[in-house]
Amino acid sequence: MSNQGEYPEDNRVGKHEPHDLSLTRRDLIKVSAATAAAAVVYPHSTLAASVPAATPAPEIMPLTLKVNGKTEQLEVDTRTTLLDALRENLHLIGTKKGCDHGQCGACTVLVNGRRLNACLTLAVMHQGAEITTIEGLGSPDNLHPMQAAFIKHDGFQCGYCTSGQICSSVAVLKEIQDGIPSHVTVDLVSPPERTADEIRERMSGNICRCGAYANILAAIEDAAGEIKS
């Protein structure tokens, strides 16, 4: 009769089966030989060559712009947008960075008289161009008629989009005056008329998150009578 508390032979503490992953001396020699062979097939120089090269330094270009009537000489990274050149290099921060994807119009400026989203174009593409920002339209003592109309009709709330709205509004009236049609122009032979629908369509690329659209339209219609060709 077995003593109480005595375990069977195969279940005694410390009794284990050999580990399946045990490494013998023969296996160790095989692994060492394989490692040495790999070093011959893939020498250090080949492995080093596969490491990506360091990022090259940015290309810098001289750039001449005529901004708000003043000639500016810059040296910019060729990847710099016109928006960043105006804000970071020339410190003209009236032009706002909104979406930075050309979808809100907050960065609208006038380039050679035409409106442009400054975040969508590279500065070096405008060598020698004449650029007008909100700072160049008027001054606190001598407001542009469009600036005065926006104030008169409360064409803004938070004001973040206002510089782009005003620059775009000035260009819209010039487009209509020059006979450039829009998507809602009915008669493509005759010059387009300055209707509310025409203005709304042409201003649709400028987003006002505060929703001051009715007042913006009123401001544009008011200023149109004062802006001369």
Swiss-Prot record:
Top EC category: oxidoreductase
Signal sequence segment: 1-53
Residues given in the record as [2Fe-2S] cluster 1 binding sites: C99, C104, G105, C107, C119
Pfam families documented for this protein: Fer2, Fer2_2
GO molecular function: 2 iron, 2 sulfur cluster binding; carboxylate reductase activity; metal ion binding
EC numbers on record: 1.2.99.6
Alphabetized InterPro entries for the sequence: 2Fe-2S-bd, 2Fe-2S-bd_dom_sf, 2Fe-2S_ferredoxin-like_sf, 2Fe-2S_ferredoxin-type, 2Fe2S_fd_BS, Aldehyde_Oxdr_Iron-Sulfur, Beta-grasp_dom_sf, TAT_signal
Source organism, top-level taxon: Bacteria
Cofactor binding note from Swiss-Prot or TrEMBL: Binds 2 [2Fe-2S] clusters.
KW Nucleotide-binding (keyword) present: no
UniProt-listed SUPFAM superfamilies: 2Fe-2S ferredoxin-like, CO dehydrogenase ISP C-domain like
Cofactor needs: [2Fe-2S] cluster
Stretches for region Disordered: 1-21
Gene Ontology cellular component annotations, sorted alphabetically: periplasmic space
Oxidoreductase listed as a keyword: yes
Compartments in which it is found: Periplasm
Assigned keywords, A-Z: 2Fe-2S, Iron, Iron-sulfur, Metal-binding, Oxidoreductase, Periplasm, Signal
Predominant location category: periplasm
Reaction catalysed by this enzyme: an aldehyde + A + H2O = a carboxylate + AH2 + H(+)
Annotated positions binding [2Fe-2S] cluster 2: C158, C161, C208, C210
Role this protein plays: Oxidizes aldehydes to the corresponding carboxylic acids with a preference for aromatic aldehydes. It might play a role in the detoxification of aldehydes to avoid cell damage.
Subunit structure: Heterotrimer composed of PaoA, PaoB and PaoC.
Protein name listed in UniProt: Aldehyde oxidoreductase iron-sulfur-binding subunit PaoA
Organism: Escherichia coli O157:H7
Gene name, Swiss-Prot/TrEMBL: paoA
